Amino acid sequence: MKSGREGGTWIGMKSDGKFAATTFYRQSKKFTTSKAKGRGHLVSDFLKGDDDVENHLKKVSNEGDLYNGFNLLVGELSPNGETKVGWYCNIEDKQVTMLKPGIHVLSNKTLNCSWPKMGYGKKRFARIIEETSTKKDLVDELLWLLKDRKSVV
């Protein structure tokens, strides 16, 4: 593992309802640099920190140019049902976006982009949450979806 890249993760959730995930942004190697900061800490920084969703993403956006391309999705689920989810991409848009309720998809481009695999995943996810009646089945089905390697063209 390269120095400065250890200890990171791409997805995480805490028992208090905080969660985060990051993806790299798919781009030509000519637009990346080996001198960029590692992105692995982006998820754990949110999970370990005290900032709310929007403030955390604003802080990350202030340093966005120091990294190769990435998406960062962070959120908080509260016991009263209020959910706050935000997204930031350091390549396109470069604005912190607070998400409205609904199903959103994220891969290696922008949020809700129109890649075939995104449409496929969104439809599968919607069907799973509509048709699943127990927590165990929901978890099993969602894990199966994450493992799905079906080629969609």
Cite the ranges covered by each PLM segment.
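N-terminal nucleophile
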Residues: 1-153
